[in-house]
Amino acid sequence: MAEQKEFFGVKYKEGSLDPKTAQLVFFAVCIAIGHAGGAKRHLDKARECGATEDEIWEAVVYAMRPAAAKVRDLAKEIIAQ
């Protein structure tokens, strides 16, 4: 059952995501912000929760998309000048 919590003023119910999905989200966020230690820990936990290699790589691609779009848009802007 999800437990009501608060983090930096945001109210949420911890446990709303299944454990594997939560660990994949943690992993993807850690990868996106360059937190290698956190990424390794959450990758191990995701695998313990049954994450497949395909699910792990899909999470990596999701982590890359915002940065890739930003790089592309900035490049287009600069090249067009």
Place the predicted regions along the sequence by residue.
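Ligand-binding pocket scaffold of soluble enzyme catalytic domains
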Residues: 59-60
